[in-house]
Amino acid sequence: NDNTLSLHDALPIYLPAGAQWIDFWTGKSLKGGQTIQREVPIDIMPVYVRAGSILPWGPAAQYSTGKKWDNLTLRIYPGADAELTLYEDEFDNYNYEKGAYTTIAMKWNDKDRTLTINDRQGNYKGMLKNRKFNIIIVEPGKGCGDGDATTFDQSVSYRGKRVDLKL
């Protein structure tokens, strides 16, 4: 039995029931509760994101402190409501155990197509006080794959206070 993959094999992938699933690479939405055959090149891992997810996407970096996350993309996978708590700390010590970290709670209302970015909670030495969030609602051909997007549905300057966005 040869378990090696050829250059373009079709793999069986089970998508759990109770949700829509969005192909990370293409943005195509698929119904859960089924096994699909996904043809993939050898250098691509099939990844499916549950509809109703918010995925923060930072700059490519070799290590956690390599680049500031002052220009962060939020990929919204529509089809259901979503929540995300963005957690940040100093990256390189245990000060988070003493409360040195921040959280920013976010909520996506799929029906109203609104994103709420709540007040930042907490603080730590060297934290970003201001940043830009670039928001993309993922769809086929938009906000897909592991590259950096160049166009966004909306961008907002965030200064730690609640922002409500209609997308």
Each PLM stretch: what is its role?
Residues P12, I22, T114-T116:
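General beta-strand recognition
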Residues I44-D164:
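Accessory, solvent-exposed terminal regions and/or long lumenal/extracellular loops of proteins
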Residues A10-P16, K107:
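Long hydrophobic segments that form regular secondary structure
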Residues N1-D9:
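Single conserved hydrophobic/aromatic residue that forms the stacking wall/gate
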